[in-house]
Amino acid sequence: KLFDIDVVFNALHGGYGENGQLQKYFEKYNIKYTGSGPKASELAMDKHKTKLIAKSNGIPVLDWEIINKGKKINLKDLSFPLIIKPNDGGSTIGLYFADNKDQFEHYILSAFNESDTLIIEKYFKGREISVPIVDGQVLPIIEIKSSNFLYDYESKYQSDKTKYEVPAKINSKL
């Protein structure tokens, strides 16, 4: 036995702590840990793969485009407003709202500082809903109400103005 560890409480945020790599390491060495397994973690942190799985299961998703660093982008084909975000990662780090081509060109460079692969999708104004599931049990649904235009990093971690409605008021037909 390489380690004398009862269990790892995985509270790492981002990167290897969330993308399945650390979880693979734990499993390789038979180390018990909290949180999702390697595959679930990998899929949760890869927006492109997650969208493909959702779409293949009949779940509506916004159309998206994958943009890799160094790839030429045809700006005349873009329809605004757009959301630009890293394909990997979370916490809305590197999330940008572009309302025109000038903003897009500026924000795409900033987003590439966070990741070499980006997701571009049409902006959709909707409600921010979270459905927590633990061990297959659905917990009360949460509506997140940000005082900012977008539910961004600041809204999530730095603002005391973000409100959480539990349970969310959702039409029972849904």
Which residue ranges define each predicted feature?
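Short, intrinsically disordered, charge-balanced linker/junction segments flanking boundaries
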Residues: K1, L62, I170-L174
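ATP-binding N-terminal substructure of ATP-dependent carboxylate-amine bond-forming enzymes
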Residues: K1-T34, P38-K39, L43-M45, K49, ...
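Active-site nucleotide/adenylate-binding loops and adjacent lid/helix of ATP-dependent enzymes
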Residues: L2-F3, L43-R127
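Glycine-rich phosphate/pyrophosphate-binding beta-alpha loops
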Residues: G14, T92, S147-L150
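Short glycine-/acidic-enriched loop or helix-start segments at secondary-structure transitions
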Residues: N19-Q21, I93-G94, S130
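Phosphate-binding site of ATP-dependent enzymes
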Residues: D99-K173
